[in-house]
Amino acid sequence: MIQVLLVTICLAVFPYQGNSIILESGNVNDYEVVYPRKVTALPKGAVQPKYEDAMQYEFKVNGEPVVLHLEKNKGLFSEDYSETHYSPDGREITTYPSVEDHCYYHGRIQNDADLTASISACNGLKGYFKLQGETYLIEPLKLPDSEAHAVFKYENVEKEDEAPKMCGVTETNWESDEPIKKASQLNLTPDEQRFIELVIVADHRMYTKYDGDETEISSKIYEIANDLNVIFRALYIHVALIGLEIWPSGELCNVTLSADDTLDSFAEWTKRDLQKRKRHDNAQLLTGMIFNEKIEGRAYKKTMCHWKRSVGIVRDHRTRPHFVANRMAHGLGHNLGINHDGDSCTCGANSCIMSATVSNDPSSRFSDCSLNQYSSDIIHNPYTSRCLYNGPWKTDIVSPPVCGNYYVEVGEDCDCGPPANCQNRCCDAATCRLTPGSQCAEGLCCEQCRFSTEGKLCREAKGDWNNDYCSGQSGDCPRNPFRA
């Protein structure tokens, strides 16, 4: 019998609030100190796993109690995830580490409209969550024999450089005569789920910046990938880390002050080297280089799935992984073909992912313009989406399945989320099985829990694709081949 694990951690607020402190996230003004105290509701004698699949944290923010629900990001790594390092004499060393019992989580604050949290539980609690529209960070205080953590607003972190920063992609502003749909009205369904199998490469400047600590670099990349999953949920895109590479002995492509030249050189390297030994949909270079003209990153536009140009480059900020993830998401957005936001585009935050100017308060949201462009055009473009159908599928994602996480995994017919949130009458949220009499729970060929009739048009021809028709045997809309 499968036992449901409930972990509650009570965080008692320290008797005082600090005014200023130097943390891993940087210099922080105005923070709260809390002490995690873990209480586990496990049967007597049960073996507690190192990192639970689901956890709950209760603590106070500004004197108000909140409940943080966390669930392990089971799809963070693909099944054939690998790490490539290099020996001092330049020999390539590729390993396939066991990543099933990792410590990276997604979550939400109970009863808060913004379902956003990204947390590492590897050594204490480190990450961010959204509460009442504001971004809060939590991280351990490095005190001897202490479980103390700091909780603080993102806006209270002193920025290393307040000057405006730019995206290196130009002439891509949103322009449309069509009325902009609100995000809640977009026709994005689980049937349109896509997957980006991502390789992240840390260059030699990253290696020297982190004093050769490859473990710290890898942890930073895991945090970034975990954040990317939170960001791309709105597009029904799952980002799976399929490879990580670190360059300890020197740059393997030309990394210069010019973001354009660096991007071109990295693209050439992926063509002549990476593609021959590691399948992937997209590769991103994380660099310690500070580019000219305050450029934070660069990416080719509308090149996702391209044999050579499905790449991007992003400047690292050591203390701000969420900021780096925001910039990498921006570049991936351009790879997909998403334009910069115009003045009329909104996302309910101070800035959105595809804003042309980089905000010091990074967003986790795509604007209504981005969502509209993606759902109405990009998702149906065979050139920029053809590689995003092939997984990792439910048989490829590492870690045991968990019912209620919105992902249909091995042994499940459907997954509409927790019972309190499920709005799909075809799916039993408690068991992730179809309800009695139902043939399907979702898909373009699923109507009122039954398969659509064979031959029904489910997706019109577009570009090089033929019309797609229901088979009568599945709720999914099968892809027909390219036109001759």
UniProtKB/Swiss-Prot annotation:
Where are the glycosylation sites? N254
- Domain of life where this protein originates: Eukaryota
The record's subcellular location field reads: Secreted
Q: Where is this motif: Cell attachment site?
A: 462-464
Could you tell me which InterPro entries the record lists for this protein?
A: Disintegrin_CS (IPR018358), Disintegrin_dom (IPR001762), Disintegrin_dom_sf (IPR036436), MetalloPept_cat_dom_sf (IPR024079), Peptidase_M12B (IPR001590), Peptidase_M12B_N (IPR002870), Reprolysin_adamalysin (IPR034027)
S-S bonds: C305-C387, C345-C369, C347-C352, C403-C422, C414-C432, C416-C427, C426-C449, C440-C446, C445-C470, C458-C477
Pyrrolidone carboxylic acid is found on Q193
Tissue expression:
Expressed by the venom gland.
So which residues are the signal peptide here? 1-20
Q: Which SUPFAM superfamilies match?
A: Blood coagulation inhibitor (disintegrin) (SSF57552), Metalloproteases ('zincins'), catalytic domain (SSF55486)
Needed cofactors, names only, are: Zn(2+)
Tell me the cofactor note: Binds 1 zinc ion per subunit.
Entry keywords, A to Z: Calcium, Cell adhesion impairing toxin, Disulfide bond, Glycoprotein, Hemostasis impairing toxin, Hydrolase, Metal-binding, Metalloprotease, Platelet aggregation inhibiting toxin, Protease, Pyrrolidone carboxylic acid, Secreted, Signal, Toxin, Zinc, Zymogen
Query: Which Gene Ontology molecular function entries are recorded, alphabetically?
Result: metal ion binding; metalloendopeptidase activity; toxin activity
Q: Does the keyword Protease apply?
A: yes
Give residue ranges for the propeptide: 21-192
Q: Record-annotated residues binding Ca(2+) 1?
A: E197, D281, C387, N390
Extra information = The disintegrin domain belongs to the long disintegrin subfamily.
The family classification in the record reads: Belongs to the venom metalloproteinase (M12B) family. P-II subfamily. P-IIb sub-subfamily.
Please state what the protein is called: Zinc metalloproteinase-disintegrin stejnitin
